[in-house]
Curated annotation (Swiss-Prot):
InterPro entries: KIAA0040-like. This is Uncharacterized protein KIAA0040. Residues 65-74 have a biased composition (Basic residues). Residues 54-81 are annotated as: Disordered. Keywords: Membrane, Transmembrane, Transmembrane helix. It is a single-pass membrane protein.
């Protein structure tokens, strides 16, 4: 118990020393001490959101994705068809270079 109180006491002494050195050090300490708190709050929010979200929404998303994939496959099959005729037309339209 003494080690823990000594640890926090040393941190408090460091904070007071840096505060006396200037406002810039106080702002830096505030940011550095606030970042872990922000991370903990964010993780807590994400965990609560995942645990409390309705299970119905999770089950519906893959079904929609399957339908979209099927539609994309059909479109991709149509897009993969290559005709030789347009290439011939393009070559005929290209002007010949004078020699």
């Amino acid at each position: 118990m003494e080690r823990i109180s000594a640890f926090f006491s040393s941190i408090w002494d460091t904070i007071l020393t840096k505060h006396q050195e200037g406002i810039y050090n106080t702002i830096c300490l505030g940011v550095l001490l606030g970042l872990p708190l922000l991370v903990i709050i964010t993780l807590l929010f994400i965990c609560c959101h995942c645990c409390w979200s309705p299970p119905g929404k999770r089950g519906q998303q893959p079904e929609k994705n399957k339908k979209k994939k099927k539609k994309k496959k059909k479109k991709d099959e149509e897009d993969l068809w290559i005709s030789a005729q347009p290439k011939l037309l393009q070559m005929e339209k290209r002007p010949s270079l004078p020699v």
